[in-house]
Structure formats: structure tokens, C-alpha cells
């Protein structure tokens, strides 16, 4: 039994095509494998935790007597997005996919937004959040139109200048869009208000961003932990992904390295339960942008922080490192890839080591539930008794 579990999701760090990759157009994808081959990876601490034993990675040693336990996990849900991956890690099987809109949103949805808001919509395509205000910000100021855009994730974002559209009005419009896109035919995971300020050529997004997410489609192990008096400390995007459900404390982060800093602060305080950290830069800055070298450096930077994380662990802490999907930066397009994800498990009190049987994302939730003696979901098999 562990008093605390520290679960770190390396967002999009997949480890080879999943058995159903063909359904997603992702045959041949391999985030870690292709990064190792094309850019090289110097990751001695992840090696020592057994990463190289899960699948062959060019230049990464398969350390037979590694610390802790290693395996790979398969996703059973129908999506390959962030919310689906995290929700499955916490015990849900998502049977309806969230939708992405690589060609923009349908005209009928835009018309509903225009009719409700009394404002026109511009852009309506995937765009970087900073580039979209550079390109459309001045037009928005002159016309009062709504800048509606998306990304490779199932999100609809609305940008508006705070001096042109008051925050309350922007929030009201986003709430309306949230209400009409929860179900088929849209199934959009998040609506995001993206206010900005400044003058043409010098626009900046403000901290008044607001996310309109969805509650998970069922009871997760986070809910079980919270209901039974355990701490559930969310670091990074986790609170947004679960819409606050099952979370007892939420900490925002600015980057991967800030995320590690925040996690270390959490680890150095007294609590019983789960710390749940998402490190998003792998996905947001390097995966979608197909930046192989940047992705490799980000993995190496995380590897360099692992000794600090392990030093901060108490004797009865368990560290779990995994991912939520793939995002192979060598693959065509800009979207996530359907892949296995790694699982590394380490505790200072382990007296043995080795590989765990290959499993499923929700095995993590089943293991955490068994450890804290709280109800699990119907999905997943606990590997707790194999961590010796």
C-alpha cells in the first residue's frame, strides 16, 4: 500500500501504433520510436526506469535490471484526444468520439452562433491562437465580428478584443455554444473564450481565458478518491480535462518545466492520495507542429528532472509515468496518432523489478482504486499486487 501516488502524463508520448491504428489512419505511427531514430534521445533516467525495454528505441538502452516496472498500455475508447485518454486512464470507456473539425465548423452551427450573438463569424479554420489574433484581430476590432477557430483537438475557440466585446458578453456567447454542442452531431469537447487586448501588430491574449468543458461521462476513480476523503491534486491541464470533477486542489502551470516545479512543491507537502500532473508541451508545442528536434529536447529536459522527482518521493510513494495518446512529429498531418502508451512504475520500497503484463489505460485507475481501497469502475485490471 502506498500513501501517495504521483501520476505524470507525458502528453502525446506514444510508443508505437495501436492494434486498431488502421481505423484512425495511423498505421506506422511511433512517436518515441521515430523521435529516437530521427533526432536521437539521451535519456539515462528514463532508461533506468525501463523505457527501453518496452519497445526498441534507437540509441536508448534496454536496461534489463532497470528500477521498477515497465509495460505498454492500449486504449479501448473510440477517440485519440486528450479528454478521452485521460478519462480512460481514470476508468471510463468512451464509446462516442469527440469530433474534430480540420475543415472548420458546419455552416448551420455558425448560423446559430451568429443568430444568438447578433455578430458575424470570421476565420472558421484550425489556427494557432497567437497567429489568429495577429491575422484577424484588427478586422475584429473594426467590425465586432467573432473570431471562431479550432485546432487538432475537439475544441471551438472564440477570440474577441476586450474593448470591443465585453468579457461578460463573450462568456455568455461561449456558454450558449457549449449548451448546443454537447451532443451529436457536434460532440465538441471544449469551448474556450480567448479574449485579447492591445493594438494591431501588438495584440496579447489575456488571463481572462475561460474553458467550458464537459463533465466526464460517468463516475471516475478521482470521484471515488475524493468521496472517500483522499486528496486529489491536479497539476496542469488535469482540472480542465475533468471539469473539476473529483479534484480537491488545482494548480495551473505555464510549461513542462513549471509543471515539474509545481509537482515538486506538491510532493514536498503532507497529503494522502493522488497527485495527477499533465505535461502538455510535448503535444502542444512539438507534436502538432511536427517539430521532431523540439520534441526530442523536451523529452530530454523531462529526463533531466527525473532525479529531482525521485529524490522528493517518500518511502511509501508510488510514481507512475504514462501518456494519453500519440502525436508522432514525423507523421503526415498535424493530428494525434493512435498508439500504445508507455507505463513506468517506481517506488523506493520496491525490492523487485521487471515488466508488467501489457494492459489497458484503465488498469491505472484500477490500481489506484485498489491501493486506496475505494470503488473502481468496471474497466481495467489492477496491477498493484505485482509491484513488489
Curated annotation (Swiss-Prot):
EC nos: 5.4.2.7
Primary subcellular site in the record, as a coarse category: cytoplasm
Binding site for Mn(2+) 1: 11, 324-325
Annotated positions binding Mn(2+) 2: 283, 288, 336
Family annotation (SUPFAM superfamilies): Alkaline phosphatase-like, DeoB insert domain-like
UniProt cross-references to InterPro entries, sorted A to Z: Alkaline_phosphatase_core_sf (IPR017850), DeoB (IPR010045), Metalloenzyme (IPR006124), Phosphopentomutase_DeoB_cap_sf (IPR024052)
Alphabetical GO biological process terms: 2-deoxyribose 1-phosphate catabolic process; 5-phosphoribose 1-diphosphate biosynthetic process; metabolic compound salvage; nucleotide metabolic process
Family per record: Belongs to the phosphopentomutase family.
Role description: Isomerase that catalyzes the conversion of deoxy-ribose 1-phosphate (dRib-1-P) and ribose 1-phosphate (Rib-1-P) to deoxy-ribose 5-phosphate (dRib-5-P) and ribose 5-phosphate (Rib-5-P), respectively.
Name used for this protein in its record: Phosphopentomutase
Source organism (scientific name): Enterococcus faecalis (strain ATCC 700802 / V583)
Name of encoding gene: deoB
Amino acid at each position: 500500500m502506498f500513501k501517495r501516488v504521483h501520476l505524470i502524463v507525458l502528453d502525446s508520448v506514444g510508443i508505437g501504433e495501436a492494434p486498431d491504428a488502421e481505423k484512425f489512419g495511423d498505421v506506422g505511427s511511433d512517436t518515441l520510436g521515430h523521435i529516437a531514430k530521427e533526432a536521437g534521445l539521451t535519456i539515462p533516467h528514463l532508461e533506468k526506469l525501463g523505457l527501453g525495454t518496452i519497445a526498441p528505441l534507437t540509441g536508448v538502452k534496454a536496461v534489463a535490471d532497470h528500477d521498477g516496472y515497465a509495460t505498454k498500455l492500449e486504449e479501448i475508447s473510440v477517440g485519440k484526444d486528450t479528454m478521452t485518454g485521460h478519462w480512460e486512464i481514470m476508468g471510463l470507456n468512451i464509446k462516442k468520439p469527440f469530433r474534430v473539425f480540420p475543415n472548420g465548423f458546419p455552416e448551420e452551427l455558425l448560423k446559430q452562433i451568429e443568430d444568438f450573438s447578433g455578430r458575424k463569424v470570421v476565420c472558421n479554420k484550425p489556427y494557432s491562437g497567437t497567429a489568429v489574433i495577429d491575422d484577424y484581430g484588427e478586422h475584429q476590432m473594426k467590425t465586432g465580428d467573432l473570431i471562431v477557430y479550432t485546432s487538432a483537438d475537439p475544441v471551438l475557440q472564440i477570440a474577441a478584443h476586450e474593448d470591443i466585446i465585453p468579457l461578460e458578453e463573450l462568456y455568455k456567447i461561449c456558454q450558449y455554444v457549449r449548451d448546443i454542442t454537447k451532443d451529436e452531431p457536434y460532440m465538441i469537447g471544449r469551448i474556450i473564450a480567448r479574449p485579447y487586448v492591445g493594438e494591431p501588430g501588438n495584440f496579447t491574449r489575456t488571463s481572462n481565458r475561460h474553458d467550458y468543458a464537459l463533465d466526464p461521462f460517468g463516475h471516475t476513480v478521482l470521484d471515488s478518491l475524493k468521496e472517500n476523503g483522499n486528496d486529489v491534486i491536479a497539476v496542469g491541464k488535469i482540472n480542465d480535462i475533468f471539469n473539476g470533477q473529483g479534484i480537491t486542489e488545482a494548480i495551473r502551470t505555464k510549461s513542462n518545466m513549471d509543471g515539474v516545479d509545481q509537482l515538486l512543491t506538491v510532493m514536498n507537502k503532507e497529503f494522502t492520495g493522488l497527485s495527477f500532473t499533465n505535461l502538455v508541451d510535448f503535444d502542444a508545442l512539438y507534436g502538432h507542429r511536427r517539430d521532431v528536434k523540439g520534441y526530442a529536447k523536451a523529452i530530454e529536459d523531462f529526463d533531466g528532472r527525473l532525479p529531482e522527482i525521485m529524490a522528493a518521493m517518500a518511502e511509501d510513494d508510488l510514481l507512475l509515468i504514462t501518456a494519453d495518446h500519440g502525436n508522432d512529429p514525423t507523421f503526415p498531418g498535424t493530428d494525434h496518432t493512435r498508439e500504445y502508451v508507455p507505463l513506468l512504475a517506481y517506488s523506493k520500497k520496491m525490492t523487485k523489478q521487471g515488466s508488467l503484463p501489457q494492459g489497458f489505460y484503465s488498469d491505472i485507475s484500477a490500481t489506484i482504486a485498489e491501493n486506496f481501497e475505494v470503488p473502481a469502475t468496471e474497466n481495467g485490471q489492477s496491477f498493484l499486487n505485482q509491484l513488489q
